Amino acid sequence: ATFDAAGARLFTATWDARLWAIGEHRTAAGEALLPGTGYLELVAEALKAQGETGAFEIRDLYFLRPLAIPEGAARDMRLRLARSDAGYDFAVQSAAEAEPGGRVGFQLNAEGRIGFGLTPPRPLDLAAIEARCRDGLREDPAGLRSPQEAHLDFGPRWRVLRREAYGPGPEGRGEVEP
């Protein structure tokens, strides 16, 4: 990690589609993408590298454009972590050519804010949630198919949801297997 001219921490990497989290997360047309949860993991890892170990909250998260990696190519990316009054602001950027063979700059893929000082949530009563969530039960030991699979081609490591059910209102439960 380095720092930019404003003193913000910069975490950089070069990725290609051999990284399973990207190579096994493709559009139906075959384009490899960093999944949305990948941005969250990047933020968590950057905070850890920054020495932040407490609970945090991501606010005002905007996905502005996909971080796509063409087959057989690599893409430079960076995460900028800048201190703010509430915690940090972050931006994830990926390298982009202004025109083929032209100058390379960075485009903004996602941005958000990070806050601290959260009160830890109280423990969940999993038995009570399970008792309420009996509708729409679906299960498959090999992994349930996601509605997103109509548009995305996931590799086998993404099919982790084994069981799901819903309760009254906006409540549901799922069982995942890593």
Residue ranges and their predicted role:
Residues 1-178:
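Acyl-thioester-processing domains in fatty-acid/polyketide/NRPS systems
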